[in-house]
């Protein structure tokens, strides 16, 4: 399945040209492309949603000359060589995000009205995953550098996101110890525990007031999501994960502290690319920061948290 190990002649895209005191990442060359990428007809469509917290200066992003001959803004100029393959969109309107300050992540992908008495709706990534998810081991992948979530289920419950690159890599590409039988026993135990939780919660629900029942219902929805994912994991037990070259594993299967934000983000982005290349998932959300605060970015001269 993986193009990483079966096509030994492929050059890693992060291979660097080193000399005269600098390092430069190579552009995408033909020798870096896997054979399966030769034909666009066979390529699945993928979606990745990356959230930049605390806003941006829209004047630096917006396209001021539209149409086929559009001109990229200053901050988007590094995409110039790809301009024929992308469509920048400006002027989107998100009225339900007004006035919620540092909680915009809650409705960024749902567009729903959200408040103390409102229930969120399904996020666009999960709508897409509902169509493409049956074809991959993971219907979607939820990532966040500080745990704040973007994906929302059809019942309005936020899906958990992982922030540790090593945990993400192992979940995608490392077979659990003990073989298939041990994995199946572990999943069966999880299902049994979930059944007990659901059974106890149903009996408790009749004793609660309206507000508490609503909160319990949201909790039970989250439990059911875990149950669905557990059953899905069991259905994929007989399908081996792709084998990843040890050099690539060494670069990506590691804990990267947030204090090294540039390294952290590059590692997460590379894991996303690898997940797409091996078709482990076709939908990803990645929240790159926390609303209201910002970590130091030593690579660009920001040496302390904000």
Protein language model regions, located:
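Ligand-binding pockets and gating/stacking loops
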Residues: 1-306
